[in-house]
Amino acid sequence: MQVKSIKMRWESGGVNYCYLLSDSKNKKSWLIDPAEPPEVLPELTEDEKISVEAIVNTHHHYDHADGNADILKYLKEKNPTSKVEVIGGSKDCPKVTIIPENLKKLHLGDLEITCIRTPCHTRDSICYYVKDPTTDERCIFTGDTLFTAGCGRFFEGTGEEMDIALNNSILETVGRQNWSKTRVYPGHEYTSDNVKFVRKIYPQVGENKALDELEQFCSKHEVTAGRFTLKDEVEFNPFMRLEDPKVQKAAGDTNNSWDRAQIMDKLRAMKNRM
């Protein structure tokens, strides 16, 4: 399994990622969230372009799915005999041909991919959990549901739904035994800003060792995609630590009386105000 991260909209502030997921053994690939063709296509080799079997969206927002039609047209012109699918969570994803149900299994060459529906940021949000059975490598493409040390805004959902998405749907599908080997590839590079928010919850160095290490990494590296795992998220991401008394206190639950949805909603509101 190989993952190529492609920057999009960094100069305009969007700091999006497109990803080329490849099964190098079978020379097949998926192009995930290629919203900006002029930025994506020059980053692909001719062999990579020919290898694309599907354009894949994590959700329908323009900065993830608006490149579908142009990319599809380009790839068909490049290889007229090939069939390129468009995979997404709803008909709102342009040119979509496959809308997978929750936990639908798909294959890319030898790679096994589970489609985890995570409605909240949008109703059609999907995270794609990938396993390479040959090497046992694993990763997950989380779009705007899970960011490194953060999560997406609840545009079309609630705190309860985001809690379910992060802490049930993703974690339980992947399985605790696989958290430490499942690398996270989010839709945006928001990590540095997220660290500033999380530091308000754990203000002292030493309170959260995982956060300290993430902060140090961010001080030296611009790109964090694929560098951290689900286990890391459970250790430093407050949206995945709702049972932590420090997270509860930061949200305003001083007597441990709030339910998880209330804590999640308040955390998101606090992050929105930053």
Swiss-Prot record:
Question: Would you name any one GO CC term?
Answer: cytoplasm
Query: Where is the protein found, in the record's own terms?
Result: Cytoplasm
Residues at which Zn(2+) 2 binds: 63-64, 144, 188
Q: Name one GO biological process term.
A: methylglyoxal catabolic process to D-lactate via S-lactoyl-glutathione
Q: Which InterPro entries match?
A: Clx_II_MBL (IPR035680), HAGH_C (IPR032282), Metallo-B-lactamas (IPR001279), RibonucZ/Hydroxyglut_hydro (IPR036866)
Q: What is the designated name of this protein?
A: Hydroxyacylglutathione hydrolase, cytoplasmic isozyme
EC number in record: 3.1.2.6
Recorded catalytic reaction(s): these are: an S-(2-hydroxyacyl)glutathione + H2O = a 2-hydroxy carboxylate + glutathione + H(+); (R)-S-lactoylglutathione + H2O = (R)-lactate + glutathione + H(+)
Pathway(s) per entry: Secondary metabolite metabolism; methylglyoxal degradation; (R)-lactate from methylglyoxal: step 2/2
Q: Which GO terms describe its molecular function?
A: hydroxyacylglutathione hydrolase activity; metal ion binding
Protein residues bound to substrate = 153, 188-190, 268-271
Uppermost EC category? hydrolase
Q: How does activity depend on pH?
A: Optimum pH is 7-8.
Q: Which family does it belong to?
A: Belongs to the metallo-beta-lactamase superfamily. Glyoxalase II family.
Which species is the source of this protein? Saccharomyces cerevisiae (strain ATCC 204508 / S288c)
> How is this protein's activity controlled?
Inhibited by various thiol compounds such as glutathione and coenzyme A.
The UniProt entry lists the main location of this chain as: cytoplasm
Misc: Present with 13700 molecules/cell in log phase SD medium.
Phylogenetic classification of the source organism: Eukaryota, Fungi, Dikarya, Ascomycota, Saccharomycotina
Positions bearing Phosphoserine: 257
